[in-house]
Amino acid sequence: MNADNPSVPGAAASRPWWKVVLLLLGGFLLFMLLYGLLQSAFFLTDGRSVLNVAAGFICGAAILAVYSLMVRLFERRRPADMPARRFLPDIGGGFLLSIVYFAAVTAIIALLGCYAIDSVSFNASVFFPKLAFFFLVACGEEVIFRGVFFRIIDEKWGTAAALAVSALLFGLFHIFNPGATLWSSVAIAIEAGLLLGAAYKFSGNLWLPIGIHWGWNLMEGPVLGFAVSGNGMAPGEAVCLSTVSGPDIISGGAFGLEASIFAAVIGLAIAAWFVHRTARR
């Protein structure tokens, strides 16, 4: 992970507030539309695993390319949050962090008797398309919530406002998912909204939060067998065929591990560490 966070003045800092709001709304609508279209394109390749994998990574890269182009066109500068030299180290570091994070949460709820692995099997034709799909999801959602909302609000109104607003919006974004509750949205805002925003500020780039988000979804669903933000794994889709039981506040219930109190507490602790390290610089 990179601890460098170059302070590069953005176009939003010198613009009137109403123009910044228009920039936020325009960016949100553009990338939500693009994200939806690219997800549809990905699902058109279902059943053809090699093409499916390629489609996931190509669609994820397409979102990043359009983001880079939009920054150049509308802000008249290179995107400072996409340094090529940090791509592999920070995506890899974020991915590894998520594996450790979700392994720790799963171990806790397993010790409490709320999670058990019944059997283990690996199907490459199912796993690798999921790997590619969640790369697309990570790229799309991180561009929208960190590249657009967090970055622009941070440039105009400061980091505290950027963390609060982007986390709140990220929680609201998931409130209509299957199995969602008010608590699951609050938990997502805490453990993902704050954590991913703090990781973006700490690293100064999109790669670290993309890596965290990517590894998070992959570990939660296709590896451990939990629902991912309410979207359950069908039999045979996850490496671990598991049984989840007990109180929803512990296990996460139908929404998945993200709605566990332990995921929220540990995620908040990691976010606080990123904020502390950033503030020390």
Task: Give the location of each predicted region.
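Membrane-embedded alpha-helical segments of multi-pass membrane proteins
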Residues: 54-65, 127-132, 140, 187-194, ...
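N-terminal, membrane-interfacial amphipathic/helix-forming hydrophobic leader that caps
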Residues: 1-78, 221-281
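Membrane-helix interface segments
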Residues: 17, 49, 87-88, 123-124, ...
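Functionally important transmembrane alpha-helices
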Residues: 185-249
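Juxtamembrane helix-loop-helix connectors linking adjacent transmembrane helices
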Residues: 8, 37-55, 72-143, 150-155
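Small-polar-interrupted transmembrane alpha-helices in polytopic inner-membrane proteins
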Residues: 103, 134, 138, 158-175, ...
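Hydrophobic alpha-helical transmembrane segments
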Residues: 21-25, 54, 91-96, 127-128, ...
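Membrane-interface helix/loop boundary segments of multi-pass membrane proteins
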Residues: 10-11, 140-165, 169, 198-205
